[in-house]
Amino acid sequence: MHIIPEKDIAALITRQDSFDAVEKVFSSMAAKTAYNFPVIREAIGHADALYGFKSGFDRQALNLGLKSGGYWPGNAAKGLTNHQSTIFLFDADTGKCRAIVGGNVLTALRTAAAAAVSVAHLARKDAKVLGIIGAGHQATFQLRAVAEQRKFERIVAWNRSPEKLSALADVAAELGLPFESVTLEEL
C-alpha cells in the first residue's frame, strides 16, 4: 500500500492533469461507465464540524475510491484549512486498499478542474468577464484553472467578507488581469 502525504501532492499533479482527469471522468459518467455512490454527510456534534464520505467507481479504468473528510469552521484560527480530507484508493478486484492520499490539495484541484471543464465546454467562447462568488480556500485554485479556459479581460468577485478578496486580487494580478471587488447587487 502506498501512502502519499499532503505535502507531496502539489509536486505530483498539475492543473492540466486535474483538468484531463476530471474531463475524462465526466465523460465516463455521461457514458454510465463511472458513477458516484450516495454521499454521506453529517454534523458530528463537536467543533461545529461536518463530516462525510464521497465515493465512486469507474468500471473501465477499475478505479475505486473513497474520500473521507469534512469541514471544520474553526480550523482557520488554528492555521489549518477548514476543509480536511483523506482519499483511499482500492483494488477493484480484491477490495484491498492500494493507497492513502492526502486529500486537501487534491480536493481543491479537483473542484477547480470541475469548474474549468464546465467553462471549457459550456461557457461562451467570447466570454470576457469572469465572476467569482466566494473567496474561500478553493477560490484561488478555481481562478487559476478557469482563467486558462477563456481570454478573460477582467475578474469581478464578491465575498461576504470583502477583506478576504485580497488573495483573489493577488492571483488576478499574477495573471495580468484587472480585478474588481463588487457588491452582490453589482455581480
Locations of the language-model features?
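Short internal alpha-helix immediately C-terminal to a glycine-rich phosphate-binding loop
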Residues: 110-130, 137-149
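NAD(P)-binding Rossmann-fold cofactor-contacting core
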Residues: 149-175
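General structural feature for long, well-ordered alpha-helical segments within catalytic domains
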Residues: 14, 18-21, 111, 138, ...
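Structural motif
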Residues: 132-133, 158, 182
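Conserved beta-strand segments of alpha/beta enzyme cores
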Residues: 2, 154, 178-180
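Short acidic low-complexity segments
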Residues: 175-187
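N-terminal ligand-binding/catalytic initiation module
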Residues: 1-107, 114-116, 126
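Acidic/polar active-site rim loop that often engages polyanionic ligands
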Residues: 2-4, 147-151
